[in-house]
C-alpha cells in the first residue's frame, strides 16, 4: 500500500508540474522584446547611434506602453516613453527627456519597431539602455531587453591577421586535398589503361603462338584440299 501510495503521489506531483508549465509557457512565449544580437555597441563621440528595439506578441496588442531608460553607476532616468494604440498605428511619444533623442520606430508592415536615435553623443552617454514594453491586452504582461553603449574617441581597427592566416591555411589544405584527389584519379586512369594494353598484348601474343605451333583454331591447322 505504501509503494502504491508513493507512486500515486509522484504521478500527481508530476501532473501538477506539467499543468503549471502549460499555464506559464504562453506567458514566456507571447511578448518578446529584442535589441539585436549584439549586447554591446560602440560609437564615436559626437556622432549618432541607433539603439534598436523590436517587440512581438502572439496575442496582438492594444495601447501598448513602451519606454527607454538609461542607467550607469551614478544615475538612472527615463529617456522616452509612449503608447502604440494598435498594429495600424505608429508609436506616439508622451515624454522625452532629451532633445537629442528621436523615435525612429514604426509598427507598419508588422515591424513593431520602437528604436531610438541618439545624436551628438557624449562620453557621459556610456551606459546601459533598456527597452521596456508592457501589453495591457495580455493582462499587463511586460518584458524588456538591455544593450550597453560605449562612447569612444575613435573606433579601434580590427586586426584581421589571425583570421587571414587561418583562412589561408584552410584554403591551402582544401587545395591540397583537391590536388591529391585529382592525382589519384589520374593515376587510377593511367593504371587502368596500362592494364588494358597489357591484356591486349597478351591476347595478341597468345594468338601468334597458336599460329606458329599449329594449334587448333590457328591457320596452320588448315589443310589443302585433296585432289581427286
Swiss-Prot record:
GO molecular function, one term: sodium channel regulator activity
Record topological domains on the Extracellular side: 31-161
Region (Disordered): 199-228
Domain of life from the UniProt record: Eukaryota
Domain Ig-like C2-type residues, every copy: 31-148
Residues bearing glycans: 45, 71, 113, 142
Matches recorded under PROSITE patterns: IG_LIKE (PS50835)
Bias-annotated ranges (Polar residues): 203-213
Disulfide cysteine pairs (residue numbers): 53-131
Keywords tagged on the record: Cell membrane, Disulfide bond, Glycoprotein, Immunoglobulin domain, Ion transport, Membrane, Signal, Sodium, Sodium transport, Transmembrane, Transmembrane helix, Transport
Main location: membrane
Compositionally biased residues, Basic and acidic residues: 219-228
Protein family membership: Belongs to the sodium channel auxiliary subunit SCN4B (TC 8.A.17) family.
Designated name of the protein: Sodium channel regulatory subunit beta-4
